[in-house]
Amino acid sequence: MAFLKKSLFLVLFLGLVSLSICEEEKRETEEKENEQEDDDKSEEKRFLSLIPHAINAVSAIAKHFG
């Protein structure tokens, strides 16, 4: 009977360790995805802020040549 208890304890322990490792990997993956989304948003904001400057530059060039 003691052998069964030890075996059961070992199986449960290894299962919990495995579950913990899987959850940690999942959390790391989600953090990387969130960081990537934040980077994409900041790049988009920088690009959108350049549009008015580009329009002004094009209109200045058009006035100079036209």
UniProtKB/Swiss-Prot annotation:
GO biological process: defense response to bacterium
Transmembrane region(s): none
Cysteine-cysteine disulfides: none
Top-level taxon of origin: Eukaryota
Keywords linked to the UniProt accession: Amidation, Amphibian defense peptide, Antibiotic, Antimicrobial, Cleavage on pair of basic residues, Secreted, Signal
Proregion span(s): 23-44
Post-translational modification Phenylalanine amide, affected residues: 65
Keyword Signal: yes
Signal peptide as annotated in the record: 1-22
Pfam families referenced in this protein's UniProt entry, alphabetically: FSAP_sig_propep (PF03032)
Cell location: Secreted
Principal place of residence: secreted
Region (Disordered): 24-45
Tissue specificity field: Expressed by the skin glands.
InterPro entries with a match to the protein in the record: Frog_antimicrobial_propeptide (IPR004275), FSAP (IPR016322)
Cellular component terms per the entry's GO annotation: extracellular region
Biased composition annotated in UniProt, kind: Acidic residues: 31-41
Function text: Has antibacterial activity against the Gram-negative bacteria E.coli ATCC 11775 (MIC=7.2 uM), and the Gram-positive bacteria S.aureus ATCC 12600 (MIC=3.6 uM) and M.luteus ATCC 49732 (MIC=1.8 uM). Does not inhibit the growth of the fungus C.albicans.
Family (UniProt): Belongs to the frog skin active peptide (FSAP) family. Phylloseptin subfamily.
UniProt name for this protein: Phylloseptin-Az2
Source organism of the structure: Pithecopus azureus (Orange-legged monkey tree frog)
Organism placement in taxonomy: Eukaryota, Metazoa, Chordata, Craniata, Vertebrata
